[in-house]
Amino acid sequence: MSTGLLDSWADAGDEFSAPPEVIANPDGTKTVITFRTNQDGKKVKITQKIKEVKVQEKVHPLIAQRKNWKKYGKEKNSPPGPDTSTTQLGEKVDLKLGTSWKQDEKKEEEDKAHERAQKIAVQTIKCRVCGGDHYTAKCPFKDTLGAAAGVTPSGTTPEPTSEGGAGAAGAGKYVPRHLRADANGNVPTREARDDSTTLKVSQLNSFVDEDMLRNELFAKFGPLQRVTIVRNRETGESRGFAYVSFATEEIAQRALDTFNGKGYHSLILHLEWSKKKKT
């Protein structure tokens, strides 16, 4: 006859060795009943109701056929699915379904154009007193920093006392390179620049740049001293005309006779001397 202690061991062994009780319900579900001992040493009955759900995925027949293809080469014994060490995955593309995709694309382009316009406006507007992105006349520091920057309280630059191209232009205006003073403060005169070999090319398309003029039109006339397209200072877009300087007046005359009145990118070119000839 076994003792009470041995009976409890036997009961514990029967508890853990007994399989769970499974009951089939009329609605297709299953009830699983198990017994176990919790942390307090008490015997607990656990009842679980399980419902089996069959999920069927519909794919294209060709896709299902490709999934059954056998791998070969280095991937012969690899499990199903791509391996990133031997397979390069393409970029994930989000498919937007709907009828308003054209309007959405147009709105995105308008937003990008608005952002570019704001960036250009911020870059082109610069205060001469504090360097901020606002006009000098509206600077909040012009009363305190204006004297150091040479700006009057009204927002204007006082007239310089020295004469010449660089002095008359003022501190906030652009001075062309050929009119800037040298190290000794000497400003070149207008007569020092020779424009006798320079042609003015008008009626240019907006997308034409210096390289197009040089390579497509005037390169065959020999080396060019200067090719400059006049652009808008704020937007950077072409204003439709340019200046081209040649080695000699004879070469410039040949270029004028060749291209004046000829078509170039849907427009008729007009060539003339940048400086009128003396008769």
Swiss-Prot record:
Superkingdom: Eukaryota
Gene Ontology biological process terms from the UniProt entry: formation of cytoplasmic translation initiation complex; translation reinitiation; translational termination
Pfam families named among the record's database cross-references: eIF3g, RRM_1
One Gene Ontology cellular component annotation held by this UniProt entry: eukaryotic translation initiation factor 3 complex, eIF3m
Bias type Low complexity, positions: 152-163
Database matches in SMART domains: RRM
Protein's cellular compartments: Cytoplasm
Domain RRM: 197-276
Annotated region described as Disordered, given as residue ranges: 1-26, 66-115, 152-171
Keyword vocabulary terms for this entry: Cytoplasm, Initiation factor, Phosphoprotein, Protein biosynthesis, RNA-binding
Biased composition (Basic and acidic residues): 102-115
Claim: Cell membrane is one of the keywords in the record: no
Keyword check for Nucleus: no
SUPFAM superfamilies: RNA-binding domain, RBD
CDD domains: eIF3G (cd12933), RRM_eIF3G_like (cd12408)
List of residues that carry Phosphoserine: S78
Molecular function terms, GO-annotated: RNA binding; translation initiation factor activity
Function text: RNA-binding component of the eukaryotic translation initiation factor 3 (eIF-3) complex, which is involved in protein synthesis of a specialized repertoire of mRNAs and, together with other initiation factors, stimulates binding of mRNA and methionyl-tRNAi to the 40S ribosome. The eIF-3 complex specifically targets and initiates translation of a subset of mRNAs involved in cell proliferation. This subunit can bind 18S rRNA.
Assembly and interaction partners: Component of the eukaryotic translation initiation factor 3 (eIF-3) complex.
Stored PANTHER family: EUKARYOTIC TRANSLATION INITIATION FACTOR 3 SUBUNIT G
Family statement drawn from the similarity comment of this UniProt entry: Belongs to the eIF-3 subunit G family.
UniProt-recorded name of the protein: Eukaryotic translation initiation factor 3 subunit G
Source taxonomy: Eukaryota, Fungi, Dikarya, Ascomycota, Saccharomycotina
Gene designation: TIF35
